[in-house]
């Protein structure tokens, strides 16, 4: 059950993206709109919405913005209709990249994403070209403390349906199937553990290490993609360097 953490190899990219406060509010708002549109405006019965709200609060998105986003999602407020679009492509040295976007104009976004790939050593691919290299999973992270017994936490996670458990430097990582992500998360919280991160994500089945030259090109491409206002998430299979 215990193993090496793939999440640790890719998450500092996420942290870097999250630090861009100027754009993160827009992305958080779109996440809430999408979740409310798909599952209704009650976070108690809509786990995706609950997760989106919690993440928004962690970044201090004002409550009125959260409520307005929920109402846009449920149709109580007007506004442009948002659609989720997935793009797949290749970066420098054949790296695999998946881009999740929420947009009110698919033609505009497709053109912008294609332009970013073309100008930064990448190629936009067809649907299904790289998704087979990834697994869609739930990731739950619990920070290590002196009071936590690793075996006890692992048993709680396993009994709730977790698929994998690993101990990394300073934290425990629990991997779940997306279908029982919320169930495992609630079991861990009920047992008294404090969760530091929890989300549905795409983890690469294998990661690759790039040469310094290719890595620099790859990082520039990822930064450009993440800077696009319509882009919500960018996933890849590159082993990241420490910053």
Swiss-Prot record:
One Pfam family this sequence matches: Transcrip_reg
GO cellular component: cytosol
Membrane-traversing stretches: none
Keyword annotations: Cytoplasm, DNA-binding, Transcription, Transcription regulation
Any single biological process term in GO: regulation of DNA-templated transcription
InterPro entries, alphabetized: Integrase-like_N, TACO1_YebC-like_2nd/3rd_dom, TACO1_YebC_N, Transcrip_reg_TACO1-like, Transcrip_reg_TACO1-like_dom3, YebC-like
Domain of life, source organism: Bacteria
Subcellular locations according to the entry: Cytoplasm
Coarse class of the protein's main subcellular location: cytoplasm
GO MF annotation list: DNA binding
HAMAP family: Transcrip_reg_TACO1
NCBIfam families: PRK00110.1 (NF001030), PRK12378.1 (NF009044), YebC/PmpR family DNA-binding transcriptional regulator (TIGR01033)
Family: Belongs to the TACO1 family.
The protein, known as: Probable transcriptional regulatory protein TTE1135
Species for this entry: Caldanaerobacter subterraneus subsp. tengcongensis (strain DSM 15242 / JCM 11007 / NBRC 100824 / MB4)
